[in-house]
From Swiss-Prot:
GO terms for biological process: protein processing. Residues 9-24 have a biased composition (Pro residues). SUPFAM superfamilies: Formin homology 2 domain (FH2 domain). The keyword Translocase does not apply. The lineage of its organism: Eukaryota, Metazoa, Chordata, Craniata, Vertebrata. Its EC number is 3.4.11.-. Residues 80-200 are annotated as: Peptidase C39-like. This is Actin maturation protease. InterPro entries: ACTMAP. It is an enzyme of class 3 (hydrolase). Belongs to the ACTMAP family.
Length: 307
């Protein structure tokens, strides 16, 4: 072999340039992608206080409240927590647990793990109000009253009294795109915690002794902790619930009738979700038997529960 032939051998081709980096939305794994509601909440904080945020919400809708009625607002502030995955029920319970007396520190991870250990959930979902009640009693140590048959009729007075007494209620409902109640047959089943109530009563029903006016809305009266109330339910013309859920830091004000209708029609799991290959825990009778027409009233004084 000649030296000339060796010198004529071509050099190896250069290595190809590295591929461009993936866009951030593709570089993240599916499990770490942020949902829109998580991105919206990032870097923000909730408005704290029993009445601060509620007053703002009511003020933004002031024209929709008849000044011919006496308006009373009751609320016991619960903190906000943004859910990660289908944890709406456990997050709602975590919020409500902040009203326990005496106070008790409760980690969301404890709720999730206890629910899994008891076979109530696989992914954090809670499709059984009965299981949710047992979980709350077990972990929170409080008494839980589970109502069935819907939020209207005889149950209305029970629910109103509970909220007037500044006690939380866990409500399953169908969640619309703006987190408000809607009617989707259970395909958007979600949990919220109601910690307050706004009542519009007939003129002359209320002694304002324990109901000072709101600073910015003098027609709105705020219940003090020692307020004692007892009116016939027929004197109540309008009812709104003040609620939070795990996809927003903010309180929302919902018409009681709207929540009741949404709660009543929870019939089935979203077929697309049911067939996506993910394991979920469904009670016998499915969503309809597990959630429809049911709410949980948490009695937060755990000392009374022990007695």
């Amino acid at each position: 072999m000649s030296l000339e032939n060796d010198a004529a051998a071509p050099p190896p081709p250069p290595l190809p340039p590295p591929p461009p980096p993936q866009p951030p939305s593709l570089a993240r794994s599916e499990s770490s992608k942020k949902k829109l509601y998580q991105a919206l909440a990032e870097g923000r904080t909730a408005v704290e206080g029993d009445y601060e945020e509620a007053s703002i919400i009511i003020g933004q809708r002031e024209s929709s409240f008849s000044k011919d009625l006496q308006w009373l607002l009751f609320n016991n502030y619960v903190p906000s927590l943004i859910q990660d995955g289908p944890q709406c029920g456990l997050v709602a319970l975590w919020m409500a647990a902040h009203l326990l007396q005496p106070p008790k520190t409760l980690l969301l991870e404890t709720l999730v793990q206890t629910a899994k250990d008891n076979g109530y959930t696989e992914q954090g979902e809670m499709f059984s109000a009965s299981d949710m009640a047992k979980l709350a009693e077990d972990v929170c140590g409080c008494r839980v009253q589970r109502l069935s048959g819907g939020m209207l009729g005889e149950n209305t007075a029970v629910i109103l009294k509970h909220l007037i007494n500044r006690q939380p209620i866990l409500i399953p409902y169908d969640e619309d795109f703006n987190h408000e109640p809607c009617l989707r047959n259970g395909h958007k089943a979600h949990w919220a915690v109601a910690s307050g109530i706004l009542l519009g009563l007939r003129e002359g029903c209320v002694n304002y002794k324990h109901f000072p006016p709101d600073i910015t809305l003098p027609w709105l009266r705020l219940a003090q902790s020692e307020a004692s109330v007892s009116w016939p339910i027929d004197d109540i013309e309008e009812v709104f619930v003040l609620a939070k859920q795990g996809k927003s830091l903010r309180y929302q004000l919902w018409e009681f009738e709207s929540v009741a209708q949404s709660n009543k029609q929870l019939k089935e799991m979203d077929p697309q979700r049911a067939s996506d290959g993910t394991r979920y825990v469904l009670p016998p009778g499915g969503v309809q038997d597990g959630l429809a027409g049911q709410v949980l009233l948490l009695h937060t004084n755990t000392e009374q529960t022990k007695n």
